[in-house]
Amino acid sequence: MAAGMVTVAAPAEAASTPSGACGSGYYLIDQHALGSVADIYLFYNGSSNCAVTWVRSPNGTRTYDLRVQIERKSDLVVAPDGGFYKYYAGPVKIGAANTCISWGGSAEGIRWASGWTHCG
């Protein structure tokens, strides 16, 4: 993926772990709780960040209002995803070498955003 690329992936099959949603080569660099409903996970693979808002205890039938996004500071490009999902929002990916990102999201109205961080 080129450094300027932004993607929102919709896997054919639901991933079984947050890291699995991003794909191979990504490792966890940060996470934040959204109350008791979900967590936002941030992954990195050496050139791109990936974020997922992951429901903690899905029952397989209920849908949750979930949002996730990453913003790149160098040009303010945003990679967002949101809607009503059973398991997770995202993954959203953005190339972010040599710049900072802001990442965050929401679950059932509980919102959080990081501010500029993970600069590199």
Sequence positions of predicted segments:
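Post-signal peptide N-terminal regions of Sec-secreted extracellular proteins
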Residues: 14-120
